[in-house]
Structures are given as structure tokens and as C-alpha cells.
Amino acid sequence: MKTILFLCIENSCRSQIAEAFAKAYSCSANKIISAGSNPSGEVNPTAIKLMGKMGHNISDHSSKSVNEIKEEIDILISMGCGDSCPQLSAKKRLEWDIPDPKKMKEDEFVEVIKLIDKKVKKFIENLPES
């Protein structure tokens, strides 16, 4: 079992979307979580709406602080927060430079969701089982 953390600044859009896709594509043995370095306290309503239209209900997700993460992280994926993301201990770190969609128009927001979907799917497909 691997613990995979998706990390962004507010844990309201990108990391929430990535968590949902990873849970959909990954085997249940993996623990998939997301958090933010400065959480907003809520999941972005546009993210909830658009993910719902794509068949992924994230309305029950919550915006969490990275300080709440107690698990040992096997793989940390930063969603593009650069220096704003804390240097957490992880066996492997990946940096995905995903634009923050929170102020984008819906059609642009959808393109970011599709980008995250594509990256997560490829990541999960190439994830070793052990």
C-alpha cells in the first residue's frame, strides 16, 4: 500500500480534483489524500459542480491543512504551488505545474480538470504495485 498526497496551496481545487481522479483510478489498497499549505476551508463550488457533471462527487470533501497529515508519505505530488508548498518528507516527490483554475471561466476550468485527469490517469497506470 502506498500513501499518495496531492498538495496545493488552498486544497480547494487542483488537489481535490486530483484526489478524486486518483481514488477512481487506483486500487483500494492505496491511500489517496490531499491537503493545502494554506487551506481555504472549503472546496471550490465550481470544482464541485464541474466534477459532478463528470461523474465525480466531491461535495463531501473538505479543505485540509498539510499540518493535519500524520501518515508517512510515499509519493507527494505538488500541483504547482512552488515555494508556497512546504518541504514535507516523502519517499518520492513530483511537481506538476498545474494552473490554479479558481478564477477561470468555466470552459478554462474544465480544461484544467481534463489536464489533471490525464496526468493522474497516466500516473496511476505507471504506479508500481508494491
For every predicted segment, state its role.
Residues I33, I75-I77, L94-W96:
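Hydrophobic/aromatic beta-strand patches that form the interior of the parallel beta-sheet core
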Residues G82-S130:
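Phosphate-binding/catalytic loops
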Residues M1-N67:
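Conserved active-site segments centered on acidic
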